[in-house]
């Protein structure tokens, strides 16, 4: 994290990242514990939604965010093809069990295993030490992240091909074979908001799988070519810089997802998320229902809740990106505040 040349800098309790910045073991513990919290939240929320589900009302007009995602990938349907929630409770309970496993892993890495992988007795573990200004170290870790993303894409593509996912065009579950047409995939960069072919959606995921697996192998196998200069990021590559780039990525994805989910009914079917939304502009963009909302989310549809929350989270993630990027570049916000009074008026006036 940025210290502005102060070797004895201290951080407040709210700066959680500062406690794991140079301790890769604790960093892994935080990752595992965070995964446990996410799994617990997903499992618990799914059970709550399932318990309150009313089959006489459209799913998109109820509190059904997690149920809608499961229905979209073909989970919860009986033999007649009707969504009854069969098997959903099992998935939710599995998430609760896994949350305990992840939480236990977080505790083990936090209190039992070494706090820094560099001190580990296992040679393979020492490769995952954190050297924020070492491009060879960072590209090695990045490569493993890309491999996991690639495997996740393969799993999704194979799930659609073997089990099948919900197709709103026929209002039923069907097996979807991916269309790996690179021309189509390239063209969908510009019209993905209106994509209406599940084959093309799966083709995009298949392409990402190959791309990410190849990128992962490349980043693991390669090292810095030539001298590590300022042009290549020397003295800029840091924990704060990487945090800022991560926030930029997740913020951008959240904003794109908001625009996509607002109107696309192929990936986000009306049967599960509610009707398409209309964009409005006030202080910032927001989306409203085009029909009367439901019984949850303050009278709004699942789609309206999903889209607006995604957009505003993305917006604030991007603000976090700008904050941490400026700090990584050496901008000291404290000096700015010291020179200004209320409402930004310079103290020298």
UniProtKB/Swiss-Prot annotation:
Keywords: Chlorophyll, Chromophore, Membrane, Photosynthesis, Photosystem I, Photosystem II, Thylakoid, Transmembrane, Transmembrane helix. The chain crosses the membrane at residues 27-47, 57-77, 91-113, 201-221, 241-261, 306-326. It is found in: Cellular thylakoid membrane. This is Divinyl chlorophyll a/b light-harvesting protein PcbB. Its cofactor is divinyl chlorophyll a; divinyl chlorophyll b. This low-light-adapted strain contains 8 pcb genes. It holds the Pfam family PSII. The antenna complex functions as a light receptor, it captures and delivers excitation energy to photosystems II and I. The Prochlorales pcb genes are not related to higher plant LHCs. The gene is pcbB. Induction: This transcript is moderately expressed between 4.5 and 72 umol blue light/m2/s. The whole antenna complex is most highly expressed under low light; as the light levels increase antenna complex levels decrease. Thus at least in this strain the amount of antenna complex is controlled mostly at a post-transcriptional level. Transcription decreases slightly upon iron starvation.
